[in-house]
């Protein structure tokens, strides 16, 4: 999922796999059973860095329309770090490549 933010707060819960979560200027590896809280307005990106699918649940609050949902449903959401548009103002480029 490429860099994005929204007005709602959200929580990601990793069900399976390994990902790299970039949250503002923070970068961390997340694995099965972990959760990440994302405050409103904070730019973030999640990238699958494992060899298996990354499955997660996420929830937003309060309810509302989130722009990247429409992109996901239409199949136009760019992959993180691949064919990505320019970073939005405030986003950090530290998660554009897989860690070595």
Language model features: what each stretch is:
Residues 17, 33, 56:
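Short hydrophobic/aromatic patches on the structural cores and recognition surfaces of FHA
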Residues 1-2, 21-22, 38, 44-50:
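Short beta-strand His + acidic residue motifs that chelate non-heme Fe in jelly-roll/DSBH
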Residues 41-42, 61:
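Short, surface-exposed secondary-structure boundary micro-motifs
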Residues 25-40:
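Short acidic-glycine-tyrosine-enriched beta hairpin
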Residues 5-21, 59-61:
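Short, conserved beta-strand element in jelly-roll/cupin
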Residues 11, 18-20, 27, 43, ...:
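Structural motif
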């Amino acid at each position: 999922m490429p860099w994005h933010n929204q007005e709602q707060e959200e929580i990601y819960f990793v069900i399976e796999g390994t990902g790299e979560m970039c949250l503002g200027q923070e970068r961390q590896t997340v694995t099965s059973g972990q959760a990440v809280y994302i405050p409103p307005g904070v730019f973030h990106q999640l990238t699958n860095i494992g060899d298996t699918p990354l499955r997660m649940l996420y929830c937003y609050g309060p309810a509302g329309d989130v722009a990247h949902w429409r992109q996901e449903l239409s199949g136009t959401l760019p992959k993180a770090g691949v064919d990505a548009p320019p970073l939005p103002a405030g986003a950090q480029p530290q998660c554009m490549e897989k860690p070595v």
